[in-house]
Amino acid sequence: MKTTSEIRQSFLDFFHSKGHTVVPSSSLVPENDPTLLFTNAGMNQFKDVFLGLEKRPYTRATTAQRCVRAGGKHNDLENVGYTARHHTFFEMMGNFSFGDYFKHDAIQFGWEYLTSPQWLGLPKEKLYVTVYETDDEAYDIWNKIVGVPTDHIIRIGDNKGAPYASDNFWAMGDTGPCGPCTEIFYDHGETFWGGLPGSPEEDGDRYIEVWNIVFMQFNRLADGTMEKLPKPSVDTGMGLERMTAVMQHVNSNYETDIFQTLIKEVAGLLNVSDLDNKSLRVVADHIRACSYLIADGVVPSNEGRGYVLRRIIRRAVRHGNLLGAKEAFFYKLVPTLATVMGHAGEVLTQKQAHIQKTLKAEEEQFARTLERGLALLEDALTKVENNTLSGEVAFKLYDTYGFPLDLTADVCRERELTIDEAGFEAEMTAQRERAKASSNFGTDYNNVIKVEGQTDFIGYDNLEAQATIVGLFSNGKAVDTIQSGESAVIILDQTSFYAEMGGQVGDSGLISTEICNFAVNDTQKYGQVFGHIGQLTSGSLSIGDKVTATVHATRRIAITANHSATHLLHSALREVLGDHVAQKGSLVSENILRFDFSQPEAISKSQLEEIERIVNRKIRENIQVTIETMDIESAKKKGAMALFGEKYGDVVRVVGMTEFSIELCGGTHVQRTGDIGLFKLVSEGAVAAGIRRVEAVTAETAIEWLHNQQKVLQQSAEFLKADSNSLVEKIQQLQDKAKRTEKELQQLKDKLAAQAGSELVKQANKINGVNVVVQKLENVEVKSLRTMVDDLKNQLESAIVVFGTVADEKVNLIVGVTKDLSSKVNAGELVGAMAQQVGGKGGGRADMAMAGGSEPQNLDNALKFAEEWIQAKL
């Protein structure tokens, strides 16, 4: 039985053998295509090539493209887990011709890959094809050249109410490239309900589309006229999950190897015995979408792609809750996913820590409100009228508890209820209008904080302020007093604490009186007021109390150094890489600075070194940092750069470090660049298509980082008994030695396997005159089994060979049959029957097949069964 990874690789290998360039999957975040929320088809990355706007160094390409359909026009989210084939994430295998081959080769390639025993080997009688009603050329190729009988070819006309509106006619839009398509369907058999394509029962599970070839041969003009393209092209798609289900002889994608592995992992984590539970399917599907989206740079948020990701995570968490999850579990699935995805999981392995950290934080954040939200929903469901949940309740769940509408719809669906979506939209519109009409005073900040007036910030020049408490909030409510031990948000009339803005984190410190201490952990801005977030450690505080607000000085100084260094870094990046560099996001904390920016390609080591040299040179120059306030037009004339995502008023603050760096900025900065001390880049990489990220440390943190690096270098040199200057050379020598040893070990294993094979020839039994070898082998690697079987078949010339081994508590079975006997004894049938004896599944070709199982204690019985089975066949 072929695994998903093997099928993926075989597709790429086949088309590579046909002269196609293997192109890596593009990001799930489409590059330079604002019309798409996510990559949802293999052709997305080639859109400009098909339109003639871009040229590639090849005219034939093949890909294994990761895709997401959740949100926007292509939204499968609500069906995921409840059907056999809906997914949020899927892989689309594709082969493409850009003005190279056309219908004849495209059809022949597809048929060869699907039916040739060398590749997938599907039975031809199980396949049906559809063509566009007037595409006689495609029909004739299928019938006269490929040899598909006429009763297996179906013409599909305009079945969507307009000319050229058909399941078998594709168009990029109302105008532009378009053309007919031909599809291949697999017949799962009479045991499944459903009719042929084009019939009233076509949506059943019997006939499943597994291959689609689009022939881009026309350009549709605005008046509907079709003109032939000078260089027609081909776009082919094969859904990997669907094809895997076919190859593994199951009807549901969730029964295939990848999903079964994930489902069992979820069940094990949550102690679930019913593996058919639909919530297991939901979680198994959603971990794929979430992990790959995060790997491609999407982060959970309340808008755009980030909100779709958040919706998927929260749906998974809610289904985990249904399965009995009591703590964060979703993030624990990432390592298993990375492993089971094979080569396609390498990107997950590289970013595993980031993916798990993001998922865990989001899961824990939602868990805090999930229980309360579900309680509210359960109460509301007992009061529904006309089987419809009110839009008002659905909106409250969304607004207060973070329940996406489709999550609430999920719960209602389980009760056979619907949601008043129009009422939900009306509530959403009303909230937008309220926000738009409100003033800066008395505004509902984050649905909780309502304070008249504003907080005056005096912290640029003062780390301590005398202030009056004008607002107190605890447990999500406005209060008059807080007591020792309570967590709260304190609003002051003025403060020296900087609130998180422009990438700079909020200050921490102490708010105190003679008898009270409130430890501030963070500072956030709510409209025009600053919220000091923390815990009262002694005494009590009330609105109107006079307090002293003292910023944690050491932390502020470290943050300030990192912020000024970020400005120098931005200018250095533009100097080395070019003016295309634009800030796309940043983080300025006390420990590290992070800077995201537009950059289409990786940065070389020499470029990174030059960037670092420039920043440190500017630090050594000890430049005076100037702060000016001016109108926005004057700032623009001065050449000031604006921060990504920030909004500016008519009057702005301009931070300058001579002409080298001039930016609009409201953050805190050093007085002279020399105060930064030292700058050290510590990482660089991609976070999304066309977006790079660098991280750096400064001052004491940079010195500590260098000390740690030096310590690692010294320890490594001592461990390898080498001088630190020759450490690289020593490592290279060890690597070369390891490769030689590995090669010698493999040669020894092959030699031992050959010797074992020679011994087994002597032990061959005769059953009705046929050489039969049935053996349980010890200490033989799985990859050596096939070699041993082939060697025995060659030595015996006419034979049936059956081996069984146990490794890591798993059974491995292999059956080999020489071609003269394969008509009597089918290796695929035999290994499949044996696999059932050891709790597994398997199959393969008539002459060679492998299987696995999970019950090693039954291997001896399986081998005895094989002997009896062979004897019966012979």
Swiss-Prot record:
Its cofactor is Zn(2+). Keywords: Aminoacyl-tRNA synthetase, ATP-binding, Cytoplasm, Ligase, Metal-binding, Nucleotide-binding, Protein biosynthesis, RNA-binding, tRNA-binding, Zinc. GO terms for cellular component: cytosol. It is found in: Cytoplasm. Zn(2+) binds at H563, H567, C665, H669. Binds 1 zinc ion per subunit. GO terms for molecular function: alanine-tRNA ligase activity; aminoacyl-tRNA deacylase activity; ATP binding; tRNA binding; zinc ion binding. One of its GO terms (biological process) is alanyl-tRNA aminoacylation. InterPro entries: aa-tRNA-synth_II/BPL/LPL (IPR045864), Ala-tRNA-lgiase_IIc (IPR002318), Ala-tRNA-ligase_IIc_anticod-bd (IPR018162), Ala-tRNA-synth_IIc_core (IPR018165), Ala-tRNA-synth_IIc_N (IPR018164), Ala-tRNA_ligase (IPR050058), Ala_tRNA_ligase_euk/bac (IPR023033), DHHA1_dom (IPR003156). Its main location: cytoplasm. It catalyses: tRNA(Ala) + L-alanine + ATP = L-alanyl-tRNA(Ala) + AMP + diphosphate. Its EC number is 6.1.1.7. PANTHER family: ALANINE--TRNA LIGASE, CYTOPLASMIC, ALANYL-TRNA SYNTHETASE. Catalyzes the attachment of alanine to tRNA(Ala) in a two-step reaction: alanine is first activated by ATP to form Ala-AMP and then transferred to the acceptor end of tRNA(Ala). Also edits incorrectly charged Ser-tRNA(Ala) and Gly-tRNA(Ala) via its editing domain. Consists of three domains; the N-terminal catalytic domain, the editing domain and the C-terminal C-Ala domain. The editing domain removes incorrectly charged amino acids, while the C-Ala domain, along with tRNA(Ala), serves as a bridge to cooperatively bring together the editing and aminoacylation centers thus stimulating deacylation of misacylated tRNAs. Belongs to the class-II aminoacyl-tRNA synthetase family. HAMAP family: Ala_tRNA_synth_B. This is Alanine--tRNA ligase. The lineage of its organism: Bacteria, Pseudomonadati, Pseudomonadota, Gammaproteobacteria, Pasteurellales. The gene is alaS.
